[in-house]
């Protein structure tokens, strides 16, 4: 009987003390739709519109057409916007275990690809993701390090990373 009372006390006290604490895998899309909309606008600003044949296989705001998808370069901006939102939601779900950093990882992986962060085959997991998973929040250097193309630093990509970090990293 005494053990039962102790268990009930522990459960009730946990419910009272931890009820206001957000869970680690909180959905950033539901928690702050304004941050998600800001992420959409940020991606639009830096990606630009891919509406010409020279941009193929990219359409809309940088969506890569996958096998089986029937998109053309003639899609409307509204269609491009909904495709972008769907892609970002999918990436947020992919990184949802990071909690408040899932939107930051989703915005980065929209540009560089999720497997540059997560690793795949012979490609190792990124230092950025390793740090976030271990709880280390000192990630500025690792985040901005995704600024190279063919081994060379691209100033516009570096600017993009700094803006994304400033907008979506929460202390």
Segment roles from a protein language model:
Residues 1-8:
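Bacterial N-terminal signal peptides that target proteins for export
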Residues 10-17:
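Bacterial N-terminal signal peptides
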Residues 18-50, 63-67, 75-94, 115-171:
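Long, amphipathic alpha-helical surface segments
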Residues 38, 54-56, 100:
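Extracytoplasmic
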Residues 55-59, 63:
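Early exported N-terminus immediately downstream of N-terminal targeting peptides
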Residues 95-101:
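Structural motif
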Residues 102-116:
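Short N-proximal segments of mature Sec-exported proteins
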